[in-house]
């Protein structure tokens, strides 16, 4: 004889989760970026909490890595912006909402924390744009225009820099006493046509800092 099944609550029964609609690629990429950034920030906090402060070059190197990780995280968020905006998170019926009410409230939070609101307000005031009266398309157009102007200014600066030489420490009197041939060699162009290869890529450096793996 078989046992008759007892009446069970369908909400408490085992439910096979369906992950087909979960943006696993975006979430996994963000998880890795957040993990790297969190580890770097924790390291900086620990170093600054010591009685003896670290050397400035050590702190500068760690800060450079942290800024690179922050930039990489920002690019990843921008890349998956549409996917994340269309994603709706919700707890499964089996989640213990009563025991972990604080955790679920934090995870499902929609409103920004006060610090984030201050960052957004400061960014809006700094860029000088009236975001309330402009549409998203107009704001993106202005941002792209600013990027174009920045690229143009950078190119002009590099072109102007290539016209001058900043090598050598000769005074005007010393240059005047030199022969023409020697004077021609005093200031050679500081722009080299030789393309130097980068010994390490940014991804390899960040992976080494985070995981300690050598190559």
UniProtKB/Swiss-Prot annotation:
It comes from Kluyveromyces lactis (strain ATCC 8585 / CBS 2359 / DSM 70799 / NBRC 1267 / NRRL Y-1140 / WM37). This is Mediator of RNA polymerase II transcription subunit 8. Component of the Mediator complex, a coactivator involved in the regulated transcription of nearly all RNA polymerase II-dependent genes. Mediator functions as a bridge to convey information from gene-specific regulatory proteins to the basal RNA polymerase II transcription machinery. Mediator is recruited to promoters by direct interactions with regulatory proteins and serves as a scaffold for the assembly of a functional preinitiation complex with RNA polymerase II and the general transcription factors. It is found in: Nucleus. Belongs to the Mediator complex subunit 8 family. GO terms for cellular component: core mediator complex; mediator complex. One of its GO terms (molecular function) is transcription coregulator activity. Residues 27-89 form a coiled coil. GO terms for biological process: regulation of transcription by RNA polymerase II. It holds the Pfam family Med8.
